[in-house]
Amino acid sequence: TMAKGMGNGFPIGGISIAPKFKPWHGMLGTTFGGNHLACAAALAVLEVMEQDQLMENAKAVGNFLIEELKKIEGITEVRGRGLMIGIELPADQPDVKKNLLFKHHIFTGEARPNVIRLLPALNLTMEQAGQFLENFKTALKG
């Protein structure tokens, strides 16, 4: 299933199934299925993603971030794909996420108490990624 980003804030959801499963009429039913406005919003998102080459950008900026994060001392592991990145820290560094938020105004997710999850917008620039890295290094120091 997929949702959220499909409509860039407009409520929509979807499902994709493997070709080996043959859908039939009536197999899936939804309360709001076939909403024309939601479909138009999703189509507009796809058009912007293609026009602005957001997938290519996410791959390039994501690879840059992952490689640069791997160079920073104090990080246990960096894993991810594109701009979905997990930064695992030693358990004795509980304040990094708090420092990022309160000192640098950077909101991050959390996969576990010692794993910071990054999931920025697909149009994140290299410059913004560089700014994040500098702030992250400072947040690690306290």
Where are each of the predicted segments found?
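Conserved N-terminal phosphate-binding loop of PLP-dependent enzymes in the Aspartate aminotransferase
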Residues: 1-142
